[in-house]
Regions:
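Short, low-complexity disordered leader/linker segments with a strong preference
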Residues: 1-50, 159, 373, 388, ...
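Detector for C-terminal structural segments
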Residues: 37-40, 229, 302, 330-361, ...
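Alpha-helical secondary-structure segments
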Residues: 52, 128-135, 165-171, 221-222, ...
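N-terminal lobe/hinge region of extracytoplasmic solute-binding protein
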Residues: 54-106, 137, 218-219
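Gly/Pro-rich hinge or "lid" segments in bacterial periplasmic/extracellular proteins
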Residues: 88, 187-245, 251, 372-373, ...
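Aromatic- and charge-enriched surface segment that lines or borders ligand/interaction sites
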Residues: 100-145, 163, 169-171, 263-269, ...
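Surface-exposed binding/hinge segments that line
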Residues: 149-200
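Ligand-site clamp/hinge motif
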Residues: 211, 239-285, 417-418, 430-432, ...
């Protein structure tokens, strides 16, 4: 039986990946493509070069699906390997990829995929249903070990079988509402390459590197890796035998930068064709460059996760939803959007992004109106009086809280923190900050009790289906993806029910109830929804089609590069 909960032994290994993986699909939720955006009416050059992308602060970790964990890794897999289906960037609907069509049984427990017959691996062997069945069964078999990082994509899967070369049948142990939305994210691997590595305990699955300097790389997507340098520049080249629409470009390069100034300079000098994500502070200057286009992509929620663990005892007042509500209405969200994100953000009010509406949830929760007077009134009513220093005292302790900031977003989040500090000082609450490389291990602690922190500024994304966004707040994710330690049995029960409800209307009602619980418990305080800002050379046309790429390397759609072209 598939499970999403990592074993105790693996949890701390997964913690380092958790926040990065949560960013996977933030851009997909708001629509990735857009067309236009710096395009010209000229004809594309007949000799298309490599499109060079610079990424600030983000890098790939591996091109082995059993080892990789960042969104950039999974974006590469979408371009390298077949997938059963994919999201359309135009309307976020699931559309065919390797599977031309699919059907499901009335009870939702059997899925049958009809695969196309013209797909081939780069070594000339055909892509068949056997490859898909092998991939799925291998992940299910080793989900508590070597394939744990892929296990979320096979939730509820019992077995996959190849009925014939182009017919795949997947049997589920129970109906899974988000099955199609998750299974397509699993890259289909060539059985003849990976089967020897899956022998025994599967430990050898982690040994393949997909480094062309060390081994033959076998893929079937529109691009293959030509040069692998995880800390520098990785280059992908076009696969001319790809079964789908052919990209115009010969390939694309992906270079990691730790310093935004170096990346921006490389763009200005012509060493790069595009750079993301740009610090909002530099966007005004770049907009003045005649050769560059600057645009925001996606809709990422920025929130405050307040410690909600019943094991946390230092500041028990934080467990009170009334205190959290007071904190929430003391915050000036519009100020954060305007001064920190320079127009590339808008105030947020719901723990789920409004793009889920109306298919999966009712109208999103309104943005909390700032009301400092009411916040002070609530805290006074709870008996938390201000001391001589202006800081309130609760349960014998000053209301001084440590807020964790993820180093990867240090520049923006430090400025967000400064505004939060100013806002909450108006209601007698003092904040301090601590920058950490990855806050989750520090938050959860070795025993996953969440004893040693007060709050954290969190940012993550979700897939168009809200299952994963809801999943992170379950009790089973304490010590893994759950940022606040929230543990509500009623919520967990609703999550399990919606996960197996294949009637859309009934599932929507369950999700509405879950959102009501999360909002009522003030599990997280939404601040803003922000965009990743990208700049690119205007000589390139249809760069906006790469919206998902700029939201961490597109993982939703293999056709993103199709119209990208350099103008004559």
């Amino acid at each position: 039986m598939s499970t999403r909960v990592p074993s105790t032994k693996r949890r701390h290994r997964l913690l380092g990946a958790a926040l990065v993986v949560l960013l996977l699909a933030a851009v997909a939720v708001s629509g990735c493509g857009g067309g236009g955006g710096g395009g010209q009416s000229a004809s594309p050059s007949a000799d298309q070069p490599v499109f060079r992308i610079g990424a600030i602060g983000f890098a790939m970790t591996s091109l082995n699906p059993f080892v990789a964990y960042t969104a950039m890794d999974y974006g590469a897999f979408m371009q390298m390997y077949p997938s059963l289906a994919q999201y359309s960037n135009a309307d976020l609907k699931v559309k065919p990829e390797l599977a031309e069509s699919w059907t499901t049984s009335a009870d939702g427990k059997t899925w049958t995929f009809k695969l196309r017959s013209d797909a081939v691996w780069t070594d000339g062997k055909p892509v068949t249903a056997n490859d898909a069945a092998f991939t799925i069964n291998t992940v299910v078999k080793f989900q508590k070990g070597p394939s744990a990082l892929l296990s979320t994509y096979v939730v509820g899967v019992k077995e996959a079988k190849a009925q014939d070369a182009t017919t795949l049948v997947v049997e589920l142990e129970r109906p899974v509402a988000a099955f199609l939305a998750t299974i397509f994210q699993l890259p289909i691997l060539p059985e003849h390459v990976w089967a020897p590595l899956a022998a025994g305990d599967g430990s050898k699955l982690a040994t393949l590197t997909n480094d062309p300097a060390k081994e033959t790389v076998v893929v079937a997507g529109p691009f293959t890796v030509q040069k692998l340098d995880l800390k520098g520049t990785t280059v992908f080249s076009r696969v001319d035998t790809f079964y789908g629409p052919k990209p115009l470009v010969k390939g694309f390069g992906y270079q990691t930068f730790a310093n935004p100034d170096a990346a921006v300079q490389a763009l200005k000098s012509g060493q790069l064709d595009a750079v993301y994500p740009l610090p909002p502070a530099v966007t005004d200057t770049l907009k003045q460059e005649a050769t560059l286009e600057v645009q925001g992509f996606g809709d990422m929620p920025l929130q405050i996760a307040v410690n909600d663990s019943p094991d946390y005892t230092k500041h028990p007042e934080l467990l009170d939803p009334k205190v959290r509500e007071a904190i929430s209405i003391a915050i000036d969200r519009q100020q954060i959007a305007d001064s920190v994100y320079r127009g590339y953000a808008k105030p947020g009010g719901s723990v789920l992004l409004p793009q889920f509406s109306p298919e999966f949830m009712s109208a999103p929760v309104a943005v909390p109106a700032r009301d400092v007077a009411k916040a002070n009134e609530v805290l006074e009513g709870l008996g938390y009086k201000k001391g001589s220093d202006g800081i309130r005292v609760a349960n014998g302790r000053p209301m001084k809280y440590m807020v964790l900031i993820w180093s990867i977003f240090r520049a923006e989040h430090a400025r967000v923190f400064d505004l939060l500090k100013q806002n909450l000082a108006e209601v007698g609450i003092s904040l301090e900050s601590k920058v950490v490389d990855n806050p989750l291990p520090l938050m959860a602690g070795k025993d996953a009790k969440y004893r040693d922190f007060e709050a954290e500024i969190v940012v993550y994304g979700v897939t168009p289906d809200p299952d994963f966004s809801l999943f992170i707040f379950t009790g089973g994710m304490r010590g893994a993806y759950n940022p606040s330690g929230y543990n509500n049995p009623e919520y967990d029960k609703l999550y399990a029910q919606q996960g197996g409800e294949i009637d859309p209307a009934k599932r929507k009602a369950l999700i509405d109830n879950m959102v009501t619980l999360l909002q009522g418990d003030q599990v997280e305080m939404p601040l803003v929804s922000w965009q990743m800002v990208t700049a690119w050379n205007k000589q390139w046309q249809n760069v906006a089609d790469l919206g998902c790429v700029f939201g961490f390397f597109g993982y939703t759609d293999k056709t993103e590069f199709n119209r990208l072209a350099l103008m004559k």
